[in-house]
């Protein structure tokens, strides 16, 4: 059995046991420690954020749906996939120089999160670019293919690897003072990812008022 089939089978088995056929439910975001919710004028101002949403992955052989929690900062990414009942099926903890993936009771490590996911799952998921796309931003190597009637980016393409990634922003929403995607679709060859952001919160260092102790 190849990596992709083994990986999706183990995750999907966990989800099926919990009775999750599609995404649903609402969970409280895990508490933050050194960062607090802030308001920003645009998503680019948020150097850190956390989101709660849904992720669906489709290939010709498999379909996978799960609840998604992601906490992102310049120093670290923490990503968790859970079932509707709250059962954790995958966790990824990554820094610029290391990555730890826990799935199906097994631990995997690498110096690069994107390389680790591809090695274990067979999926070439663009973890390095997703923080930009999730917030509706365009990377230096992204090409705009279409805009909507309001001039907002509708579709981009990234050709760092072939076949390229095509990213479609399906809908937008106001969150934390900024406008970020509500739903987006990523396609590369026969691999398709759909993300839905139910909650996106910009994070920053808490402000210290005059007279307060840090």
UniProtKB/Swiss-Prot annotation:
Signal peptide, first to last residue: 1-25
Superkingdom of the organism of origin: Bacteria
Pfam annotation, one family: LolB
PROSITE patterns: PROKAR_LIPOPROTEIN (PS51257)
Family matches, as SUPFAM superfamilies: Prokaryotic lipoproteins and lipoprotein localization factors
GO-annotated cellular components: cell outer membrane
Record keywords: Cell outer membrane, Chaperone, Lipoprotein, Membrane, Palmitate, Protein transport, Signal, Transport
Lipidation (S-diacylglycerol cysteine): 26
Localization per record: Cell outer membrane
Keyword Signal attributed: yes
N-palmitoyl cysteine lipid modification positions: 26
Topology in the lipid bilayer: Lipid-anchor
One Gene Ontology term from the biological process aspect of the record: lipoprotein localization to outer membrane
Recorded family membership: Belongs to the LolB family.
Subunit (UniProt): Monomer.
Primary role: Plays a critical role in the incorporation of lipoproteins in the outer membrane after they are released by the LolA protein.
Name of the featured protein: Outer-membrane lipoprotein LolB
Source organism: Shewanella sp. (strain MR-4)
């Amino acid at each position: 059995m190849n990596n992709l089939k083994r990986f999706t089978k183990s995750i999907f088995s966990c989800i099926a046991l919990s009775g999750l056929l599609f995404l649903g439910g609402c969970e409280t975001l895990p508490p933050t420690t050194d960062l607090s919710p802030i308001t920003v004028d645009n998503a680019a101002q948020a150097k850190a954020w956390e989101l709660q949403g849904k992720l669906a992955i489709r290939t010709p052989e498999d379909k996978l749906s799960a609840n998604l929690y992601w906490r992102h900062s310049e120093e670290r990414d923490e990503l968790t996939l859970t079932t509707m009942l709250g059962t954790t099926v995958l966790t990824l903890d990554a820094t610029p120089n290391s990555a730890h993936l826990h799935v199906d009771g097994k631990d995997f490590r690498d110096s690069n999160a994107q390389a680790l996911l591809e090695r274990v799952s067979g999926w070439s998921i663009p973890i390095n670019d997703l923080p930009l796309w999730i917030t509706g931003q365009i990377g230096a190597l992204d090409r705009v293919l279409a805009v909507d009637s309001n001039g907002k980016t509708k579709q981009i393409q990234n050709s760092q690897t072939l076949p390229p990634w095509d990213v479609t922003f399906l809908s937008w929403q106001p969150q934390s003072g900024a406008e970020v995607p509500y739903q987006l679709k990523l396609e590369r060859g026969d691999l398709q990812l759909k993300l839905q952001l139910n909650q996106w919160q910009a994070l920053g260092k808490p402000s210290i008022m005059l007279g307060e102790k840090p």
